[in-house]
Amino acid sequence: MKDLVPLRGIIFDMDGVLVDSGAHHRDAWRATFREVGLTPPPDFWRITIGRPADEAVALLVDGLERDEARRLADVKRRHYTRLARRGTVPVAGVPAFVDALARGRVPRAVATSATRRDLERVLVELGLRSRFDIVVTADDVRWGKPHPEVYLKAAAGLAVDPGACVVFEDAVVGVQAARVAGMRVIGVTTAHTGDELIRAGAERAVPDFRDVSWPV
């Protein structure tokens, strides 16, 4: 890549990047559909990856009124909270990498489609809450990914130009959001393949953080 702006800030998605939560989310969606007596589409999981629950519901079930979509999203969040009590597991290498960034005083943020309640729980359980300068959640934005709002707010909170930020993302819609925001992206292959993430705009992809160091 030519004429790259020197990187100054780093932004992480949460689910599938900091925490290996995919199985909990898949099971929560399945439990939600069972509870309301609906059959999910075969590719339901891929449709929901990286999106706020309210927006994902509207894509999964045609013709829902806004209040009903919100109710189903609340059901999904309830099931996810129950399942997440089984334990929170970081993606391999995350604690060491984030600690190294903190020691190096690299501006760092989390920008997620999860609620603030879920984010706070995850970061506290991982022992990482104090390691992030800025967190932006679904509660803080009007538009979910692939809209760039969550990433632009994170960059503004860090006081770093978007072009000087690199994002770690596991979702195609998240990669698209970060690219529209003008940021560089490295894919994390916990939900999509490396080829899928690169086609969406990631410059490369990694399986986890065990071999990642700063500058990336």
Spans of features found by a protein language model:
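Asp-based, Mg2+/Mn2+-dependent phosphohydrolase catalytic module
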Residues: M1-R8, D99-A102, V106, T115-V216
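N-terminal helical cap/lid subdomain that shapes the substrate entry/recognition surface
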Residues: D3-V106, R117
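Conserved G/P- and acidic residue-centered "switch" motifs that form tight phosphate/ATP-binding loops
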Residues: D13, V17, T112, D170
